[in-house]
């Protein structure tokens, strides 16, 4: 695809999120969501591979159905309240429909089935876009309506998403599917906390974007599509292999890495509201997720299978790694540093709480 076309589409995606962020009416929110969906579709199927086109069609159908649900909620509110305002109180039916629509857009339980299959059919850069930036607009809507929808329903769906994300990733050998279930689990943590503290939920969402972006970029750099291919990264680039292990452990929430911040502030927020049962469920789901994170780390560093010496040079030629400094390298270095050492920023972040 032409670079100028890609830049225009990316600009439209950014503008659509800004429209959703600045909207106070359901009409503008629906416009922003539709612009966001229609702009990302050509990027997802830009390679015109059969699997990529299939994933794009699945993504389009899911997003169209969820947008129709949100539009129906807006029309019901217009009929009941004679207003397009997002802050207008919702009745019980509209609250449940809107919650399910946002779960469908974010890939949360019980509407998570489409996300792993769609992500498996895309490249790592397309999966990065789908797992991070495409979640921003639905997350903004969820933040806007979290005070007018059922807190118990949102917390329950978040806890179940953590369990489903941890359980679903146990028997996976494809890195993209593992990242899909990891996304489901992390967004479950965020939704469980969002009703009690929007500030904590936003911090967790930013940390999730940084960690996921780092993992996707490293895997894209090394063409690491399954667990068996992870071992070659250490042979070809020892520094990047060790960074991948640390970022994966950070994604699992092990201290003293950045990912531990999400677990700590989430549990602190829930315990301050005397929610012991959700905390226990989240911890169990986090342990399930930690198992396949450790599998990735084990295959990346400890399982060093015998390799031919010429494989080192062929791998470097394919990946384009020659040690030169580029924007991609600088971006990956910054994200890796934030993913590993970001816990040092906790005092500065908590001072504004």
Curated annotation (Swiss-Prot):
The keyword Electron transport applies. Pfam families: NADH_dehy_S2_C, Proton_antipo_M. It comes from the Eukaryota. The chain crosses the membrane at residues 4-24, 60-80, 96-116, 139-159, 198-218, 241-261, 274-294, 330-350. GO terms for cellular component: mitochondrial inner membrane. It is found in: Mitochondrion inner membrane. GO terms for molecular function: NADH dehydrogenase (ubiquinone) activity. It catalyses: a ubiquinone + NADH + 5 H(+)(in) = a ubiquinol + NAD(+) + 4 H(+)(out). One of its GO terms (biological process) is mitochondrial electron transport, NADH to ubiquinone. Keywords: Electron transport, Membrane, Mitochondrion, Mitochondrion inner membrane, NAD, Respiratory chain, Translocase, Transmembrane, Transmembrane helix, Transport, Ubiquinone. The keyword GTP-binding does not apply. Its EC number is 7.1.1.2. It is a multi-pass membrane protein. Belongs to the complex I subunit 2 family. Core subunit of the mitochondrial membrane respiratory chain NADH dehydrogenase (Complex I) that is believed to belong to the minimal assembly required for catalysis. Complex I functions in the transfer of electrons from NADH to the respiratory chain. The immediate electron acceptor for the enzyme is believed to be ubiquinone. This is NADH-ubiquinone oxidoreductase chain 2. It comes from Pisaster ochraceus (Ochre sea star). The gene is ND2.
């Amino acid at each position: 695809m032409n670079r100028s076309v890609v830049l225009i589409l990316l600009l439209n995606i950014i503008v659509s999120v800004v429209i959703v962020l600045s909207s106070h009416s359901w009409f503008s929110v629906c416009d922003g969501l539709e612009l966001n969906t229609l702009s990302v579709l050509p990027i997802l199927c830009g390679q015109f591979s059969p699997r990529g086109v299939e994933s794009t069609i699945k993504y389009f159908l899911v997003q169209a159905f969820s947008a129709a649900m949100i539009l129906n909620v807006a029309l019901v509110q217009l009929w009941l309240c004679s207003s397009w305002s997002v802050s207008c109180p919702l009745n019980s039916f509209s609250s449940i429909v809107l919650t399910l629509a946002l779960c469908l857009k974010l890939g949360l339980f019980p509407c998570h089935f489409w996300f792993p299959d769609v992500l498996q059919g895309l490249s790592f850069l397309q999966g990065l876009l789908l797992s991070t930036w495409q979640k921003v607009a639905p997350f903004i809507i969820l933040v806007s309506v979290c005070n007018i929808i059922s807190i118990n329903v949102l917390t329950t769906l978040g806890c179940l998403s953590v369990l489903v994300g941890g359980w679903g990733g146990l028997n996976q050998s494809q890195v993209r599917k593992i990242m899909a279930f990891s996304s489901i689990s992390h967004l479950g943590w965020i939704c469980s906390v969002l009703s009690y503290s929007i500030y904590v939920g936003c911090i967790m969402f930013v940390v999730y974007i940084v960690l996921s972006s780092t993992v996707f970029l490293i895997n894209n750099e090394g063409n690491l599509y399954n667990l068996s291919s992870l071992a070659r990264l250490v042979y070809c680039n020892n520094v990047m292999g060790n960074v991948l292990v640390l970022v994966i452990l950070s994604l699992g929430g092990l201290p003293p890495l950045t990912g531990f911040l999400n677990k700590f502030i989430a549990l602190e927020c829930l315990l301050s509201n005397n929610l012991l049962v959700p905390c226990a469920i989240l911890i169990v789901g986090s342990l399930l997720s930690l198992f396949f994170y450790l599998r990735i780390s084990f295959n990346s560093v400890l399982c060093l299978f015998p390799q031919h010496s010429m494989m080192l040079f062929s791998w470097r030629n394919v990946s384009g790694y020659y040690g030169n400094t580029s924007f991609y390298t600088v971006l990956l270095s910054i994200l890796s540093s934030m993913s590993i050492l970001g816990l040092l920023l906790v005092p500065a972040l908590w001072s504004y709480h």
